[in-house]
Each structure stands twice: as C-alpha cells, then as structure tokens.
C-alpha cells in the first residue's frame, strides 16, 4: 500500500466533517431543497477529486486500490449521506454492470450510475426464499401498456395487493 491513501482519507474526512455533518439535519428532510443540497455536495466532491474513489478508472471512478479504499470508506460510512455525496453508493452495481451487462445495458446505465445521475436499488428478501443468492428471487415484473408492473411477494401477514 502506498501512503497516498492517508492524504486522501484525511481530505475525505475533512469534507465529511466540514460539508456533510453540518447539513445532515437538512439533508434528512427529503425536501426538494435538501435534494438540491445533496446534488451540490455531489458536484463539490467531483470538483475536489474525491468522487467515486473506489470505482475503476475505466468507468469514471478514482481507481483506488481496494485495501486503500477500505480505509477511506470506513470514514465515508460514518454518514449515510456521505455515501451518496461521494459517489460510493453505486460501487457494487457499477462493477456488476461493467463485468456482466450487455453492451446495450452498459451504454445506457453505467456512466449515469457512476456519475450519480441515477441511483441503484435492489430488493432481495422474500418469503419461502432463505437465501442471499439473487438467482433464487421469485418476484416478477410484467410489461403492461408500456409500464412495468412489479409483482411482489410480501413477508407480512397483513393482507395487501400483490402488485405495485
């Protein structure tokens, strides 16, 4: 490991302490203003060259070696807003798309995902499926009239509609 990661970690820590922590109460409100504030923090992280540090360089990330990134990410993990503000929230999804997606899906989603223009989401807990293996998922999606309808399986005993 190089010693450069310690400087990067210190810069990230300062960014979180000076830019994110003071704004957490406002960010937590989920208002249009707080979303705009988060967008400004994302841009500031890009300007400061501390955006998406663990992402490979060929997809627009910082290319930081994994073990060095672990120490930086420990600081990032202290604030749920820091993960988004610093572009680390999409690392696993970005690598998955980079490695396994068809060129069409990579071209459509990878760059916007790494740049923070779109956000990943993945749900995996289902009844009758005791597994962390996504190939075991039973939820389906059906395209109806140009709109995807997700057919969910609920774990709650309360009655509810099975489609969203």
Residue ranges and their predicted role:
Residues 1-87, 104-115:
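Amphipathic, small/basic residue-rich leader segments at the start of a protein or domain
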Residues 154-161:
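Conserved small/polar residues in nucleotide/adenosyl-binding loops
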Residues 117-125:
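A short, Trp-centered hydrophobic/proline-enriched beta-strand micro-motif
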Residues 85-104, 133:
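N-terminal glycine-rich flavin-associated loop
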Residues 139-141:
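A structural signal for short hydrophobic beta-strand segments in well-ordered beta-sheet cores
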Residues 58, 125-129:
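Short, solvent-exposed loop/turn elements at beta->coil junctions and helix N-caps
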């Amino acid at each position: 490991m190089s010693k450069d990661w310690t400087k990067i970690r210190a810069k990230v820590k300062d960014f979180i302490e000076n830019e994110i922590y003071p704004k957490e109460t406002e960010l937590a409100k989920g208002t249009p203003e707080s979303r705009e504030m988060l967008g400004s923090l994302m841009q500031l992280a890009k300007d400061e060259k501390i955006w998406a540090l663990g992402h490979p360089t060929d997809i627009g990330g910082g290319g930081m070696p994994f073990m060095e990134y672990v120490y930086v990410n420990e600081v990032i993990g202290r604030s749920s807003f820091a993960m988004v503000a610093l572009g680390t929230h999409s690392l696993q999804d970005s690598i998955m798309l980079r490695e396994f997606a068809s060129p069409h899906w990579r071209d459509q989603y990878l760059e916007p995902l790494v740049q923070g223009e779109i956000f990943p989401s993945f749900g995996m807990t289902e009844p009758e499926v005791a597994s962390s293996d996504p190939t075991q998922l039973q939820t389906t999606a059906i395209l109806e009239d140009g709109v995807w309808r997700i057919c969910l399986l609920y774990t709650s005993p309360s009655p509810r509609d099975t489609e969203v």
